[in-house]
């Protein structure tokens, strides 16, 4: 008997542009795909942001949605898991020091965004517009600032983890509360995963490292994801 496949997707940078909304043509195609396949989402963003990016039509076609890296889980409109956490004061002080001393001087506000079970930290800030996000992303690609902060953080606070997420942020959470926790709900051999941050410092890595290489589709952007899906 053929094993049923569970298609697991990151959202930001995989199904959508970073912090942007889903392309309308891709959305139509993806809804049809979700009608005949088991589609599961796992994202660092909260429920409201995910719906803003994808639209309710896509969100509700999915079998299950793991928001906040699997700490806030929904099936349609029903919440089935909620695992909250608060950033310790000494950890926030350490991150504030990094914020104050970053050579990248542009600040837009909302540098700490509390989400269920995790915190997103951003040097440029979550209020950055598209151009400001691009400027920081280009700077980060040259300097690896986020990777360096994550590596130092993980040595300083071994009970916590920092992972690069999206174009400007770091996802921070207790050890074991990353995206990898969602695989406990599935037969690993049944999963095909699509994500853009599958590198060791990325927030998709906790999933990709647990799967066979042939079950991981490391995408460049949503166009690449769509192209791969057409040939699955």
Regions found by a protein language model. Give the residues of each.
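Mg2+-dependent phosphoryl-transfer enzymes with acidic/Ser/Thr/Gly-rich catalytic loops
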Residues: 2-3, 23, 173-232
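Alpha-helix C-terminal capping segments
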Residues: 1-2, 30-36, 54-57, 97, ...
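Conserved acidic, metal-coordinating active-site core of Asp-based
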Residues: 105-192, 198-200
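Residues at the C-termini of beta-strands that transition into short coil/loop
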Residues: 66-69, 166, 220-223
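Short glycine-/acidic-enriched loop or helix-start segments at secondary-structure transitions
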Residues: 18-19, 50-53, 76-77, 130-131, ...
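Asp-based phosphoryl-transfer active-site loop
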Residues: 3-21, 41, 183, 204
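Active-site phosphate-binding/coordination module
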Residues: 21-111
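Structural motif
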Residues: 6, 38, 64, 190-192
């Amino acid at each position: 008997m053929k094993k049923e496949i569970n298609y697991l997707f990151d959202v930001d940078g995989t199904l959508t542009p970073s912090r942007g909304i889903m392309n309308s043509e891709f959305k139509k195609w993806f809804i049809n795909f979700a009608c005949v396949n088991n589609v599961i989402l796992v994202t660092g963003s909260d429920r409201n942001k995910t719906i803003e990016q994808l639209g309710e039509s896509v969100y509700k076609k999915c079998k299950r949605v793991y928001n906040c890296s699997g700490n806030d889980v929904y099936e349609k409109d029903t919440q089935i898991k909620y695992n909250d956490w608060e950033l310790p004061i000494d950890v926030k002080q350490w991150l504030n020091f990094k914020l104050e001393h970053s050579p990248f001087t542009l600040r837009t506000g909302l540098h700490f965004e509390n989400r269920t079970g995790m915190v997103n930290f951003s040097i440029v800030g979550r209020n950055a517009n598209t151009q400001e996000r691009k400027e920081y992303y280009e700077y980060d690609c040259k300097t690896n600032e986020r990777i360096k902060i994550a590596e130092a953080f993980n040595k300083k606070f071994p009970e916590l983890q920092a992972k690069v997420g999206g174009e400007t942020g770091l996802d921070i959470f207790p050890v074991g509360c990353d995206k990898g926790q969602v695989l406990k709900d599935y037969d690993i051999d049944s999963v095909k995963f699509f994500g853009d941050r599958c590198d060791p410092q990325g927030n998709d890595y906790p999933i990709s490292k647990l799967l066979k290489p042939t079950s991981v589709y490391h995408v460049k952007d949503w166009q690449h994801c769509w192209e791969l899906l057409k040939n699955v």
